[in-house]
A protein has these predicted regions:
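Absolute protein N-terminus
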Residues: 1-3
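C-terminal helix-cap and adjacent tail motif
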Residues: 5-13, 18, 22, 144-176
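Alpha-helix/helix-capping structural signal
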Residues: 11, 54, 125-128
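Glycine/small-residue-rich phosphate/adenosyl-binding loop
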Residues: 27, 31, 38-104
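Small-aliphatic-rich amphipathic alpha-helix that forms the alpha element of a beta-alpha
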Residues: 33-34, 79, 91-133
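A glycine-rich helix N-cap at a beta->alpha junction
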Residues: 67-74, 78, 135-157
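Short secondary-structure boundary segments
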Residues: 83, 123-124, 150
Length: 176
């Protein structure tokens, strides 16, 4: 799939077929994440690939109460992306690990789409039960949870703002 086609076609998928994901596809997706740029090349991320059905069920249970939790039920794989904030930059009151995780997660999300798969990036959850379940070390943050699978839905595109409402030329200007 061409790059700009991937960007235009990517959607948040919340319904999945239960078909297994070929390892070659999964390998390319994870490689896309591995190659993501990061602050000072620190690569503060770590990935937990949850394939075991009973572990995915337990993950779904600890996500209970999250409005996005139901997306895990049929996805054959869930990827949890973690970050070590101390292994990324902090400058001028900005913590760069969140930017690093945003970049690596978007690389992964686009690769998922390019492979003909679907995913939903879930970022709102209580991380303590997830850390306990997956034995994530205390210094790491669980930042993103991504169920992955073959889509069992084709959502329409969400409305996007027009570029001319987002872009300023040379300096910020008040819209009239």
């Amino acid at each position: 799939m061409e790059f700009y086609d991937v960007i235009q076609q990517r959607r948040s998928i919340r319904k999945f077929k239960t078909d297994a994901i070929p390892q070659e596809k999964l390998g390319r997706i994870l490689e896309a994440g591995r190659l993501a740029p990061s602050w000072a090349n620190k690569q503060c991320w770590r990935f937990i690939l949850v394939e075991d059905a009973s572990m995915r069920k337990r993950l779904n249970e600890v996500m209970n109460g999250n409005p996005g939790a139901t997306v895990y039920e049929d996805a054959p794989i869930t990827l949890v992306i973690c970050a070590d904030p101390s292994n990324s930059g902090k400058k001028d009151n900005k913590e760069y690990y969140m930017l690093d995780i945003g970049i690596v997660t978007e690389h992964i999300m686009l690769a998922i789409c390019a492979e003909g798969l679907g995913a939903c990036w879930v970022g709102r959850f209580d991380e303590r039960p997830i850390k306990n379940l997956l034995n994530i070390p205390e210094e790491y943050r669980a930042v993103a949870v991504i169920p992955i699978g073959f889509p069992d839905e084709q959502p329409d595109p969400k409305p996007r703002k027009e570029l001319n409402t987002l872009l300023y030329q040379d300096q910020w200007k008040v819209q009239e």
